Amino acid sequence: RPGHGCRKDSTSWAIPAILRATQYQRGVWSMKKILFVCHGNICRSPMAEYVMKDLVKKSGLEEEFQIASAATSREEIGNPVYPPARRKLAEHGIPCESHAARQLRNHDYEEYDLLIGMDKANLHNMFRICGGDFNNKMHLLLEYAGRPDQEVMDPWYTGDFDSTWQDVLEGCEGLLDNLM
């Protein structure tokens, strides 16, 4: 986000300098821990989690990442990925059967390097649950697609899983590029 410690290049927002500094040890990047967050953890954030896991796997970088997702609300705790979101992932050969929605916890802020929200309401609730963002770890996914002021719309309400898929894919590709 502008003015929050990120550098902008021509295509997307760079990862915070603090993340780069804490991850580089003796010439080797340590494991990158990413938590995707949305309202219920049944559509957008699990789509981002499994898309990112797929991108990382296809890049041969599975051992370098820990990727998960969470909700800001308690409404869907324990539920699987919402069926239309699950079908959209399956169309692209991405399984998500093991997913069970969980809520974001205060200590997730210390556990993860980046906490990526899908919309501004998510960010607001993430700040509240985690007690702030003192290390500039919280960002919107579309910052990494070069669209810092845009949000990934919630297909639970819009019914548009194609647009959500495209936004999630672009955001995750940009995020992976920035981390490498």
PLM region spans:
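Helix N-cap/beta->alpha junction signal
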Residues: 2, 45, 119-120
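Intrinsically disordered, low-complexity regions enriched for glutamine and histidine
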Residues: 2, 21-23, 37
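Conserved active-site segments centered on acidic
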Residues: 29-111, 177-180
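Phosphate-binding/catalytic loops
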Residues: 114, 120-180
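Short, Lys/Arg-enriched N-terminal segments with co-localized hydrophobic residues
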Residues: 8, 12-30
